[in-house]
Amino acid sequence: IEALFTRIAKGKGMPHINPVVDLGNAVSLKYTLPMGAHDLKDVTEGISVRMSRAGDTFLPFGGTEEEILEDGEVVYAAGSQIRTRRWTWRQSQHGEIEPETSYVFFPIDGFTDFNKAEVLAARDELEQKLKDVFGCETLVGFLDAEHPEMVWE
């Protein structure tokens, strides 16, 4: 979110990645919430928010070399594959949105005691626009300390 606001403040406007990611960026800016977008084509086990563990590695977006994570960093994981580190701040090359992407996960970061209402409003608006504009089928969830994982079939 910081990079988007900085880009706009410098007069560079919104970046165009693809229409679905652009929509996510617009919702992210509207609600001032960090949000990512991940291709789920290789994900079969669901997504979880957890602390990194010994042996976890991370392939940075645009990178070619895996980084070894220290224990205790907040990550989004698909099984043992780390999709983001430092919440949604650093996205992995795994899950890059491509023109043929058809299954997308949009993590929206927030805090239950601080901005839960905004997170839920952003989630609901994004879902409705994905349906109305793109004709998408959607599945939504809300992950927190009591519900750290989302599984689908």
Where would I find each of the regions flagged by the language model?
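Non-transmembrane, aqueous-exposed alpha-helical and coiled segments at domain scale
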Residues: 1-153
